[in-house]
Amino acid sequence: CSSDLIKERENSHNLQSSDAFNYWSQLHSDLAAKFDKEIEIDISDLLPQVSWGTSPEMTIAFNADIPKTSNSKKALNYMGLENEKNLLNIEFDKVFIGSCTNSRIEDLRAAAAAIKGRQKAASIKEVLIVPGSRSVQKQAELEGLDIIFKDAGFSWRDPGCSMCLGMNEDKLAPYERCASTRSEE
């Protein structure tokens, strides 16, 4: 239930006591509602996904081979990849941790815990850390997460548009590869 998800979030007490939350809580399906179809999908065996192409449907499990399809030649050429190449053998130039929707404080805490005491690999040109909002940035700095990232050789950025949109200096050069995070819920 969405309201349960909200209750798990920090500072949700402000939202839960709001008029908006009270109104939203009244919006639900009728108990006798009938739907055309209800489906349940078990994704417990789904592996992390990566994109090998230029469109969302060009996505496979991180350890899979790039499929050989008739419509992939143009995308593969653009990406500098080949059919049936395993993505585990692809080297990255940059890493991007962030985005306005996927750089919550809990995401940054998890990233900091994973890299604390480690260094950016010499083969990686740059690692960008972009907090999802100013409040996330402030909280991360209060907790010292920015120091962990900087000590690892990462770039700590201000929140805002970054590599997702590529409208500033946070862009990839042709044929550069970037590992970026997503934590869709």
What are these regions (language model features)?
Residues 1-2:
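Short, small-residue-biased leader/transition segments that mark boundaries at the very start
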Residues 9-10, 141:
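Glycine-rich loop at the start of a catalytic domain that most often binds anionic cofactors/ligands
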Residues 43, 158, 180-181:
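Pocket-edge structural micro-motifs
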